[in-house]
C-alpha cells in the first residue's frame, strides 16, 4: 500500500510541475498576442493614414484625369 501512495504522490507532483510550466507558457503566449494586437492596430492606423494621403494627393477630378483612365503607351 505504501508503494501505491508514493506512486500517486509522484504522479500528482509531476502533474503539478506540468501545470506550472503550462501556466507560464500561457502567460507568455497571452503577452505575445497582446503585443501583436497592438502592432496590428498601429499598422491598420498607418494604412488608413497612407490611404487618406494617397486619396488627397490623387483627386479624380484633377487635370489629366485619373491614372486608372490612362492607357499605357504600348496599346
UniProtKB/Swiss-Prot annotation:
Classification via InterPro entries: SlyX
Gene: slyX
Lineage: Bacteria, Pseudomonadati, Pseudomonadota, Betaproteobacteria, Neisseriales
Name of the protein in its database record: Protein SlyX homolog
PANTHER family tied to this protein: PROTEIN SLYX
Highest taxon listed in the record's lineage: Bacteria
Similarity field: Belongs to the SlyX family.
